[in-house]
């Protein structure tokens, strides 16, 4: 290779180097500009990082503060939960005690042996009373039949009238011979005739008063007494239905067959109350009427005094019957083995807290209102 070629090659290499140098300088300028821009971006980023770190610090402090407050709230809540747990345990103990008392009361309520014994005793007493009333009914029927039989009195009146006619005929035969005596005798006979007429009128008035007033008054008194018996029967049936409904609601089933049979046996006894009421009236009535009949046969002038005695007997007998029924009701409604609730008036084997809760009361409020000595069980009555 010649020198010229070397020189040309070096010139070409110098030109290429110059171009490369220019390109490198251009690139260096661009790189410096990019470095400057990146430095500016880094500065901005550093500032942003600083601000973000400050915000993070504030946020961390806020989270720490919130954590402390939350921990305090949790501690307070745990304390409340512990207190509520103690209250719940106390309530649980109270409910368990109440459940024991309630189970005892239910067992007492379900024990109706005493009630069945009382019902059996009542049935026996009512059967005996039924027999007594039947005997009174027979006596009353016999007395009424005796009072209605006045054939002997009518026969005596007929005999008396025939005797009066015979005497009058005898005096007429002697009239011609003994005018003066006959006139006097006629006057005496006329007076006696007037007396007989007055006696007959008094007897007719008494008979009319007895059959129209006394007997009707007696029948009305009997009807009133039968009406009272019917009202009492209706009240008894209403009370029986209420008791059956209460027993069904309380025990959750109907009354047993044995109790139903007891009630069925009690109904015929009540149905015979009308006959028994008539039997109660009969002795006094029969005595008064028989006394009046004897006074008619012996002393006609005292006929009117017998009526008031007969008139007063049915009412007195009815009052005695009502007093007897009232005493029997009192004895039935106040059994010895039960105690009365002062609020509702019903009888129970014991006045318990669950029952008083139905009246919006407690045992202490019940004692405050009706006294500390108010009985809660049958043993407390003594």
Swiss-Prot record:
* Record's subcellular location: Gas vesicle; Cytoplasm
**Gene it is expressed from:** gvpC1
Q: What coarse category fits the chief subcellular location reported for this protein?
A: other
The entry summarizes the disruption phenotype as follows: Many small variable-shape gas vesicles, in situ. Makes increased amounts of gas vesicles, their shape is highly variable, in H.volcanii.
Up-regulation conditions: Maximally transcribed in late log phase, probably part of a gvpC1-gvpN1 operon. Also part of a gvpA-gvpC-gvpN operon. Gas vesicles appear earlier when grown in static culture, possibly due to O(2)-limitation.
Instruction: Give the Acidic residues compositional bias ranges.
Output: 260-302, 317-336
Task: Relay the record's extra comment.
Answer: Encoded in a 14-gene plasmid locus called p-vac which produces predominantly short, spindle-shaped gas vesicles during all stages of growth.
The name on file for this protein is: Gas vesicle protein C1
Species, as recorded:
Halobacterium salinarum (strain ATCC 700922 / JCM 11081 / NRC-1)
Q: What does this protein do?
A: Confers stability, involved in shaping gas vesicles. Gas vesicles are hollow, gas filled proteinaceous nanostructures found in several microbial planktonic microorganisms. They allow positioning of halobacteria at the optimal depth for growth in the poorly aerated, shallow brine pools of their habitat. Expression of a 9.5 kb p-vac DNA fragment containing 2 divergently transcribed regions (gvpD-gvpE-gvpF-gvpG-gvpH-gvpI-gvpJ-gvpK-gvpL-gvpM and gvpA-gvpC-gvpN-gvpO) allows H.volcanii to produce gas vesicles. A similar region restores gas vesicle production in H.halobium without the p-vac locus, but it still has the c-vac locus.
- Which key words tag this protein in UniProt? Cytoplasm, Gas vesicle, Plasmid, Repeat
What practical uses are noted?
Answer: Can be used for presentation of peptidyl epitopes in the mammalian immune system. Modification of this protein to include a 6 residue epitope elicts strong antibody responses without the injection of extra adjuvant. An insert carrying 168 amino acids of gag from simian immunodeficiency virus in this protein evoked a long-lived immune response and immunologic memory (IgG) in the absence of additional adjuvant when injected into mice, suggesting it has the potential to be used for vaccine production.
Residues of the region (Disordered) are 1-21, 260-382
């Amino acid at each position: 290779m010649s020198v010229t070629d070397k020189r040309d090659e070096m010139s070409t290499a110098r030109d290429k180097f110059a171009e490369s140098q220019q390109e490198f300088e251009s690139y260096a300028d661009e790189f410096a500009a990019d470095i400057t821009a990146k430095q500016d971006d880094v500065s901005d980023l550093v500032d942003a990082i600083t601000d973000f770190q400050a915000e993070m610090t504030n946020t961390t402090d806020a989270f720490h503060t919130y954590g402390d407050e939350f921990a305090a709230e949790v501690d307070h809540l745990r304390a409340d939960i512990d207190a509520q747990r103690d209250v719940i345990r106390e309530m649980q103990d109270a409910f368990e005690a109440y459940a024991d008392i309630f189970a005892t009361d239910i067992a007492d309520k379900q024990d109706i042996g005493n009630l069945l014994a009382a019902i059996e005793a009542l049935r026996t007493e009512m059967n005996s009373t039924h027999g007594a009333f039947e005997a009174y009914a027979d006596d009353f029927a016999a007395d009424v039949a005796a009072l209605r039989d006045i054939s002997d009195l009518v026969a005596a009146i007929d005999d008396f009238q025939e005797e009066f006619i015979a005497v009058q005929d005898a005096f007429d035969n002697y009239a011609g011979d003994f005018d003066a005596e006959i006139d006097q005798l006629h006057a005496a006979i006329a007076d006696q005739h007037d007396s007989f007429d007055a006696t007959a009128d008094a007897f007719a008035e008494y008979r009319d008063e007895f059959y129209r007033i006394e007997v009707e008054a007696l029948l009305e008194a009997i009807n009133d007494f039968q009406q009272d018996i019917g009202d009492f029967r209706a009240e008894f049936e209403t009370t029986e239905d209420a008791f059956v409904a209460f027993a069904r609601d309380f025990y959750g089933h109907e009354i047993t067959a044995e109790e139903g049979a007891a009630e069925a046996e009690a109904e015929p006894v009540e149905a015979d109350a009308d006959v028994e009421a008539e039997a109660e009236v009969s002795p006094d009535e029969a005595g008064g009427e028989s006394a009046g009949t004897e006074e008619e046969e012996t002393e006609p002038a005292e006929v009117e005094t017998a009526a008031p005695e007969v008139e007063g007997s049915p009412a007195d007998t009815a009052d005695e019957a009502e007093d007897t029924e009232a005493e029997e009701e009192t004895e039935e409604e106040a059994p010895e083995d039960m105690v009365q609730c002062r609020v509702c008036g019903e009888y129970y084997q014991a006045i318990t807290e669950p029952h008083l809760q139905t009246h919006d009361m407690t045992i202490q409020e019940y004692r405050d209102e009706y006294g500390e000595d108010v009985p809660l069980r049958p043993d407390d009555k003594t």
